[in-house]
Amino acid sequence: MKTTKTFKQMKRDGEPIAMLTAYDAPSARLAERAGVDMILVGDSLGMVVLGYDSTVPVSVDDMVLHTKAVKRGAPNTFVVTDMPFLTYHSSFSETAGHVRRLLQEAGADAVKLEGGTDIASTVQRLTAAGVPVVGHIGLTPQSVGVLGGYRVQGKAQEEGEQLLADAQALEQAGAFAIVVECVPKQLGALLAKEINVPIIGIGAGAETDGQVLVYHDVIGYESERVAKFVKQYTAVSPIIEEGLASYVTDVKQRAFPEEAHTYTTNDTGWLAVYGGDKK
């Protein structure tokens, strides 16, 4: 399995890091077979899997449950788990308790925190305690209410300079990688050049050190409306819907189960009492 050292070496070697979200064992298993370098159990599961309209309602219990499933499905892949909304903004003791659950109970290999200079001290204390941390700057979904919605960050020079300062603060605090979301490609390239740890982009251009996308967006699974930065490589929803509709039709018409899908008995006593044939 790859490690934090591996990812830093990949940056030095110029090998892009392929990161993908997963929220359950079957998805994680397929991601591992496909050769994904790193799996993110994102709090995006709130919207993608749990039916919420934001990431805010997602709990530590949710993240523990889904991380366990992902680790069972992809035991040989490095797994990063999101710290949910407001789970790392109070006392460090409380933050450490949440991190302990995600690493020890759920089996995550690292945690991801949203924020820059404002959370650098927390990141520093976590990394000093031996916790691998991934940072997340730019468009931070947990803060969309403050940011004014899902919009591109860092377009103005002042915003870009702040994001550079955020990335520098996270690197100095010990983060081994930083996710940069929804920023101009020029800023994504600058961050990859100026920061010594991997910059993993999502809507940050092609010159970052890696890319991350949501599993369901990549395969076109219930993702009719996607962000500009998403490329859908297939569309499984119509195939799934067609299969389910065919199943319903077969049941209604008694076309399923067929003989190939049924069991039988040749016990003459049973047949004498209850009837039926021996086929």
UniProtKB/Swiss-Prot annotation:
3-methyl-2-oxobutanoate binds at residues 43-44, 82, 112. It is found in: Cytoplasm. Signal peptide: none annotated. Its EC number is 2.1.2.11. It catalyses: 3-methyl-2-oxobutanoate + (6R)-5,10-methylene-5,6,7,8-tetrahydrofolate + H2O = 2-dehydropantoate + (6S)-5,6,7,8-tetrahydrofolate. Binds 1 Mg(2+) ion per subunit. Mg(2+) binds at residues 43, 82, 114. GO terms for molecular function: 3-methyl-2-oxobutanoate hydroxymethyltransferase activity; magnesium ion binding. GO terms for cellular component: cytoplasm. The active site is at residue 181. PANTHER family: 3-METHYL-2-OXOBUTANOATE HYDROXYMETHYLTRANSFERASE. Homodecamer; pentamer of dimers. Catalyzes the reversible reaction in which hydroxymethyl group from 5,10-methylenetetrahydrofolate is transferred onto alpha-ketoisovalerate to form ketopantoate. This is 3-methyl-2-oxobutanoate hydroxymethyltransferase. The lineage of its organism: Bacteria, Bacillati, Bacillota, Bacilli, Bacillales.
